[in-house]
A protein has these predicted regions:
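Extracellular structured ligand-interaction cores
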Residues: 8-10, 48-50, 74-76, 173-175, ...
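Short strand-coil-strand connectors
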Residues: 54-56, 194-197
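Amphipathic alpha-helical segments
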Residues: 21-37, 90-93, 97, 182-196
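Terminal, regulation- and interaction-focused segments at domain boundaries
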Residues: 2-21, 169-179
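Short acidic, S/G/P-rich loop/turn micro-motifs used as interaction or catalytic elements
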Residues: 18-19, 68-70, 83-86, 182-184
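Vicinal oxygen chelate
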Residues: 85, 91-171, 175-183, 196-250
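Short, low-complexity cationic-aromatic patches
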Residues: 2-5, 20-21, 53, 67-72, ...
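Glycine/small-residue-rich interface belts in oligomeric ring/scaffold proteins
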Residues: 35-78
Length: 250
């Protein structure tokens, strides 16, 4: 089989409690910007609670540094493939199966391919391939089928939400900017050279700003009538532009 394109699946970032609360409580984000969910994910290996925003093929999540006992700036970038058996072979990487709990059982969720050792404390990355069994068994009231594409999984996620925006702005994530120390940047760039993802990731030296995610670029499904800026906490700013793009800075 020819190798499938490796795309962005999702990212997460840990923010301070004030920023997390401002994001969680924003009526604009939940009612206009994107499909939103606060959830606790129970896996066989761990559990965690965060807030999620779903696009068409990509999504992203935030963690509260106080609630999850994570450091502000902890970041992960998950890549994904859209076909069974499309996971690449990367020498030295570790492959395992991640499950997700539902109805008192752990359902095979996705296969994960991770660098060994992980990139750094507070910086993770992996490639994921959904299993056909996941959509066949998880929340079947939201649809039928055994699809493994990012779009099919996100469609199921959104279909079981209690409330969804009628016409959300968000289409997908198109790029990330990360600020990393030199050694972490070198390891991340080496990993990306092995993965060869079809998404733009830019790197900045650490300088005086926070570690990890500095900004996210988005493609929008519709344009705001004029440039729109929304702030969350002390330094998190989301800007929507009339050219159907947006940037969220941290």
């Amino acid at each position: 089989m020819a190798q499938s394109s490796i795309e962005l699946n999702h990212f997460y970032v840990t923010v301070d409690s004030a920023t997390y609360a401002a994001i969680e409580q924003s009526s604009f984000l939940k009612q206009e910007f994107a499909n939103f969910e606060k959830r606790t994910t129970v896996r066989a290996d761990r559990s965690y609670t965060g807030i999620y925003f779903y696009g068409t093929k990509t999504y992203f999540e935030f963690f509260d540094s106080a609630q999850e006992k994570r450091a502000v700036g902890e970041t992960a970038v998950a890549f994904g493939v859209d076909a069974v058996g499309a996971m690449p072979d990367i020498e030295g990487a570790h492959r395992d199966l991640i499950t997700r709990g539902w109805n008192d059982q752990q359902i095979p969720w996705f296969y994960r391919l991770s660098p060994v050792p992980q990139l750094a404390k507070g910086l993770e990355s992996w490639i994921m391939e959904y299993t056909p069994e996941f959509l066949a068994k998880w929340r079947p009231e939201g649809g039928v089928g055994q699809g493994v594409t990012r779009a099919e999984v996100l469609k199921r996620y959104k279909s079981v939400l209690a409330e969804t925006p009628a016409d959300a702005y968000l289409d997908d994530v198109t790029g990330l900017t990360l600020a990393l120390p030199a050694d972490e940047m070198e390891r991340m760039m080496h990993w990306m050279g092995q993965v060869k993802p079809a998404v733009t990731i830019r790197f900045l030296p650490m300088g005086q700003g926070p570690h990890g995610l500095r900004s996210v670029s988005f493609r929008l499904r519709k344009a705001p009538a004029e440039r729109m800026t929304v702030r969350f906490g002390a330094r998190s700013v989301l800007t929507l532009r009339p050219d159907k793009t947006a940037i969220w800075e941290f």
